[in-house]
Amino acid sequence: MFVKFKLKNRILVDGKEGSGKTWFCREFIDSFLNKGWNVSLLAYVDYHEGDVVEFGERYEGKADLVVAVSDEKKENILDILLSEQKQRLDILNKRGVMREPLQIAVFDECGYFEGEQREKLIKVLQNADRCNQIILMTYQHKPPMTEAGKYFNTKIHVDYLTHKPSSVTIDE
C-alpha cells in the first residue's frame, strides 16, 4: 500500500541499499495509473540493467511513451524532458494554462550529475512545476549533485529496517 504524503513534483528519495527505494518509485507511479491519470511519458533510468528491463515490461502500454535506459544514457532522458518542456512552455505561453498529460521521470540510483548533465538536470527541475512533470530521484550514498536539496521540494527517507518512507515537504 502506497503511503500518502503531501507530495510536490520534485522528489528526492534516500535510503540504504535494500531499503525499498525502487519499490517506492513503482508504487508512486502505480498510484497515478490506478487513479486513471493520463500519463504521456514514463521515463526510467537505473544502473541495474535488470531493473531497467523490468520497468519497461511492467509499464509497456500504460503511457503514450515508456522509456527505460541504463545510467550511461541518462542524458538522453534529460534531453527528452527538456524538449518536452520547451513544447509545453510554448503551449502554456499561447493558452495561458497547462492541460497537457502528466509526465513522470524516475532517476533511480543513477549516479552523480556534473557539468552539462548537472545544468540540464537543474533546468528540468526548475521547469517541472509549470510543465506538469514529476521528477523522482533516488540515492543511497551521495546526493545526485551538489546542493541537491535546494532543487527538490519533497525529500523522502526510506528506512532500511521497516521499509517505511517518511517525508518532508519544503514550502517555497
Would you name each region that the model predicts?
Residues 1-91, 101-165, 169-172:
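P-loop NTPase catalytic phosphate-binding loop
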